[in-house]
Amino acid sequence: MASFVDRVVLHVSGGTGGHGCVSVHREKFKPLGGPDGGNGGNGGDVILRVDHQTTTLLDYHHAPHRHATNGGPGMGDWRGGKNGETLVLPVPDGTVVKSKDGTVLADLVGEGTEYIAAAGGPGGLGNAALSSQKRRAPGFALLGIEGESSDIVLELKSIADIALVGFPSAGKSSLIAAMSAARPKIADYPFTTLIPNLGVVQAGDVRFTIADVPGLIEGASEGKGLGHNFLRHVERCAALVHVLDCGTLESDRDPLSDLSIIETELEKYAVDMSYAGQDGEVVPLNHRPRLVALNKVDLPDGKDMAEFVRPELESRGYRVFEVSATSHEGLRQLGFAMAEIVKAARDAVEAAPPKVTPTVLRPRAVNETGFRIRREEKAHEPLFRVLGDKPVRWVKQTDFTNEEAIGYLADRLARLGVETELFKMGAKPGDTVVIGEDDGVVFDWEPTMMAGAELLASPRGTDIRFADTGDRPTRSQKREEQQERRDAKAAARAELEAERKAGIWTESVSGRRAAQPIKESGLDSGDES
């Protein structure tokens, strides 16, 4: 099972924004509280962040689909929805982010470096945010928009100062194990090293990193062997060390022919343009500082071979070191030579002026409308496609099940000038209008409808509870009316009291009692009998 992966295709998508809320405020003694629908929360972002604890892209090889959380919907009482949580994906130092077509999007170098791979969608506005003097009680809200979604390629390019290059079984892994604390897999068969190994070397006051790159063969620049899979790990290195096998038993190989083949492959390999220097030029691999390490001189034949080829290599301008990973012969001298090259490269970088990307301000043109209309033909019928950030975003925010929301969209498009531009382009009633690309919304254009006002049974943005409220009594008027009612009740009670004292009600009651006949009791009638 693979434990090291340096190239993956990652499918990322930001969270969808929450929908706005349609709500009317309800509170005691406030029957006309007005709209109080809150805004939806924004969707979460997907961020790539450099983490030194991460050394491989293996996790994304097994789980390539990553999605941030969505934003929460808005609620009543002006409560906004919860924003979606940001999804942070740790990547190794030296990860290059590319698009599907190979365009470099970001080069992540340094602890904590971040890149937003997919931004979350914004949340929709609630009806409280949409209210105005003309639209006092909106009966609709805006929908949240989906987050960005893209397929990106992650490539890991090792961060090292020196790269060890050479044929398989030349002893590169043995050298890095002898010079540092790295413990790569070492065996006596070709292509034992299948992943780059990094080791830290201390030479005097200079501390640097060396990379053990898997063996290269003829045609590696064209993809043969491990080819491009590991040549890219050499691109960041300031210098190269050719590790030549002086103890090879193959009859058709020798250090000089091995060096010629490796140099040819390095010359053919095209370095990524993202590694250009301060002058904007890329330094080819075969033009960088190079050292030659004649390895395995501890063998009798190896020592003789090293002494035989050394004059020829020095005549070509190489600094040659006879080393042995087994006996550690010559490793100290090789380490200090590497440190000298690394220090010179670092000093050159510090002395170079900082590369500053100028900020270009491009003001919007006076006649810029924020949209454009493209005329197309579909089934021999004209089709007008409206493109632009604003109209496309407005369509995504519209709830087409709500007539008032559709009318609001029509108003916005009319104010933007879409209808006027359609007239200029020769659009006729009944023509098809599409807002957006292939996934856009299709309309049958009817210019006689004034911004969709006829779609509503009542004026848009109004509430019958708020209509004709100009004659509503004020609080002082209400208190006066209440006092008048109290005074009227007190006057009525006083009048009744005056009538009672005058005996009007008493005489009438006494008269009715006198007019009633007196009934004899049963006892009296019994006695008479």
Swiss-Prot record:
Domain OBG-type G stretches? 160-343
EC numbers listed for it are 3.6.5.-
Q: Does the keyword Metal-binding apply?
A: yes
Q: Which GO terms describe its biological process?
A: ribosome biogenesis
The answer on whether this UniProt entry bears the keyword Transferase reads no
| Domain OCT residues, every copy | 363-447
Entry cofactors:
Mg(2+)
Gene Ontology molecular functions: GTP binding; GTPase activity; magnesium ion binding
Q: Where in the cell is it found?
A: Cytoplasm
Q: Where is this region: Disordered?
A: 461-529
What broad class describes the main subcellular location of this protein? cytoplasm
- Protein residues bound to GTP: 166-173, 191-195, 212-215, 295-298, 324-326
Q: Give the domain of life.
A: Bacteria
What the entry lists under HAMAP family is as follows: GTPase_Obg (MF_01454)
General function of this protein:
An essential GTPase which binds GTP, GDP and possibly (p)ppGpp with moderate affinity, with high nucleotide exchange rates and a fairly low GTP hydrolysis rate. Plays a role in control of the cell cycle, stress response, ribosome biogenesis and in those bacteria that undergo differentiation, in morphogenesis control.
Q: What is this protein called?
A: GTPase Obg
Could you tell me which species this protein originates from?
Pseudarthrobacter chlorophenolicus (strain ATCC 700700 / DSM 12829 / CIP 107037 / JCM 12360 / KCTC 9906 / NCIMB 13794 / A6)
